[in-house]
């Protein structure tokens, strides 16, 4: 639903808008990235992504045509003329990372940059409202002052019954196959959060509330 909300709700894109479009998914082997690659590929997009070398086979199986080892290669040196950046790393990568994402986009009004990590939420979380708000505003200014004339979106999760229904259909039809990194019982939720915090989960981290 995170991917659906970002593309459909915030960027106001339709599946047909992505046919044959060049899309870059930053951090494609995580819980959201593995889902985004499959959905975008199903809608006809040509997907490039970053991940560790160990996860290249995974993202290729999901539909990525170009895989970049972020530890050894700089995606901004390899990619250009993209229509959409779906940035799962977002502002956690800092101004430099976001700027590189913007630089690979076509400079026109049909290009989109979507970040899943809102600068306001992160900086206020880290520094509190008093210090976090000015820091977020500064970050936003630094990024947007060098941005091309594109559509810039900071996405937040928003529920959608129609979206959930359609995604459920895709999963049942095996168009989208959820990638599970690990499953934790509810009493081990702290360990699950610690796993997510490493930013090295391979797919989704699942909390098992009740085992039948």
Regions found by a protein language model. Give the residues of each.
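Terminal helix/beta-alpha structural elements that buttress the NAD(P)+-binding lobe
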Residues: 1-212
């Amino acid at each position: 639903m995170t991917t659906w909300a970002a593309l459909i709700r915030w960027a106001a894109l339709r599946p047909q808008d992505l046919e044959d479009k060049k899309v870059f998914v930053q951090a494609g082997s995580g819980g959201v990235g593995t889902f985004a690659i499959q959905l975008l590929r199903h809608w006809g997009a040509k997907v490039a992504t970053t991940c560790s070398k160990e996860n290249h086979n995974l993202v290729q199986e999901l539909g990525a045509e170009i895989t970049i080892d972020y530890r050894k290669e700089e995606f901004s040196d390899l990619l250009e003329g993209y229509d959409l950046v779906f940035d799962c790393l977002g502002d956690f990568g800092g101004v430099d990372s976001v700027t590189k994402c913007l630089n690979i986009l076509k400079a026109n009004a049909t290009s989109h940059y979507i970040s899943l990590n809102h600068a306001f939420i992160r900086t206020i979380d880290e520094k509190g409202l008093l210090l976090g708000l000015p820091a977020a505003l500064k970050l936003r200014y630094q990024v947007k002052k060098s941005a091309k004339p594109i559509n810039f979106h900071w996405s937040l999760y928003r529920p959608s019954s129609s979206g959930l229904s359609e995604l459920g259909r895709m999963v049942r039809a095996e168009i989208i196959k959820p990638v599970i990194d690990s499953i934790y019982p509810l009493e081990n939720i702290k360990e699950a959060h610690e796993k997510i915090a490493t930013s090295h989960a391979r797919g989704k981290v699942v909390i098992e509330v009740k085992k039948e």
